[in-house]
């Protein structure tokens, strides 16, 4: 009977009689959840509208805290918990990865990920669960930045995970405290009561240490606090955080014989503390450096993609140099302008990434270099 099936999927928490939680290992729940994720992807598996998907959703706040596997006691841990926990995480991350093929996927990292508790010492299997999610195509995020409690905050274990995966997958930050309602002044960091800017500074400092690619300012009063109490930190992240890519040296000829191949060179730096995650499976190295020959109307008449120039490797402001030989330049004789860009190879090699340069750009997004005469 359908009603009996629904009851099998749910259990009721004693303290919150109106709250229900599924048993995520229940095959009936999984069957219907798979339909839900498939329908969700039909709407949101589109990078034009979706930046990323939090692809776990189990436990408190969907962050993998206090995940229940026992319908009679939601906090129960037995000899099967670790096995079931891993099987569920593997199932749900593969499920999202199957349907979200174009949009990055994200999971929270913390010391009791997927466990029937929300605090305590690090579970010995949590590190391997994070690695499993990443192997299934995930990025990582923490929603406890600025919380320094060793039992439930962003502490030594979480910092070690961030360091382990630095420049391999992007990390997303969200602050743990809601400064308008949480007693943040009890934090071990010594935040002063009535000084939310202390919390913002703590979150920012941990974000810089973790080399986060994105700072999530949450919503409502939290966002207002970032702008009203710590706007200088917002400005710093805009200029320092994530990736900041630019070519600091480009060598192109000013004379080209029609039909000839041309050698060009470029040197790139990433001045941000994060990295450009071109290696994400959903992106699959689709962003590449390209050169263009632009006509008098600012239209790219020829585009040459340097497939060996890989932006995901550019980190820590180090210079990365490349030399590239173009295919034959088969354009009519005349004056053109060299352009350079990072293009999306899945969208007809159109410029896709804003470069951190002040040079003039075409409407299409090509950074203009200098004129070239084709003879």
Language model segments and positions:
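Short loop/turn motifs at secondary-structure junctions
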Residues: 7, 49, 211, 332-336
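An active-site-proximal structural segment forming one wall of the substrate-binding cleft
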Residues: 18-54, 86-95, 99
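Catalytic-core regions of glycoside hydrolase
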Residues: 54-62, 67-221
């Amino acid at each position: 009977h359908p009603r009996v099936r629904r009851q099998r999927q749910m259990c009721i928490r004693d303290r919150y009689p109106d709250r229900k939680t599924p048993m995520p290992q229940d095959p009936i729940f999984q069957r219907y959840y798979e339909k839900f994720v498939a329908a969700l992807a039909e709407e949101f598996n589109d990078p034009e509208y979706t930046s990323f998907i939090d692809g776990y959703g189990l436990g408190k706040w969907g962050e993998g805290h206090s995940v229940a596997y026992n319908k009679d006691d939601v906090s129960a841990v037995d000899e099967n918990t670790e096995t079931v926990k891993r099987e569920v995480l593997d199932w749900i991350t593969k499920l999202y990865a199957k349907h979200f093929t174009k949009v990055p996927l994200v999971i929270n990292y913390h010391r009791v990920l997927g466990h029937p508790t929300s605090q305590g010492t690090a579970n010995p299997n949590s590190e391997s669960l994070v690695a499993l999610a990443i192997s299934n195509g995930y990025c990582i995020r923490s929603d406890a930045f600025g919380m320094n409690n060793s039992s439930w905050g962003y502490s030594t274990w979480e910092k070690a995970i961030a360091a382990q995966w630095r420049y391999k997958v992007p990390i997303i930050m969200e602050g743990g405290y809601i400064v308008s309602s949480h007693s943040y002044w009890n934090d071990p960091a010594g935040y002063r009561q009535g000084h939310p800017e202390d919390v913002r500074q703590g979150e920012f400092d941990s974000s810089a240490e973790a080399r986060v690619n994105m700072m999530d300012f949450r919503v409502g009063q939290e966002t207002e606090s970032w702008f009203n109490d710590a706007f200088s930190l917002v400005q710093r992240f805009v200029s320092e955080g994530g990736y900041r890519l630019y070519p600091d040296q480009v060598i192109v000829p000013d004379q080209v014989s029609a039909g000839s191949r041309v050698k060009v060179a470029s040197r790139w730096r990433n001045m941000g503390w994060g990295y450009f995650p071109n290696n994400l499976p959903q992106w699959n190295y689709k962003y590449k450096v390209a050169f263009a020959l632009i006509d008098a109307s600012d239209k790219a008449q020829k585009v040459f993609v340097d497939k060996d120039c890989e932006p995901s490797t550019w980190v820590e402001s180090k210079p990365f140099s490349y030399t590239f030989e173009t295919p034959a330049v088969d354009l009519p004789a005349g004056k053109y302008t060299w352009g350079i860009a990072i293009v999306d190879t899945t969208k007809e090699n159109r410029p896709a990434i804003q470069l951190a340069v002040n040079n003039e750009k075409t409407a299409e997004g090509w950074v203009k270099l200098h004129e070239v005469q084709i003879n």
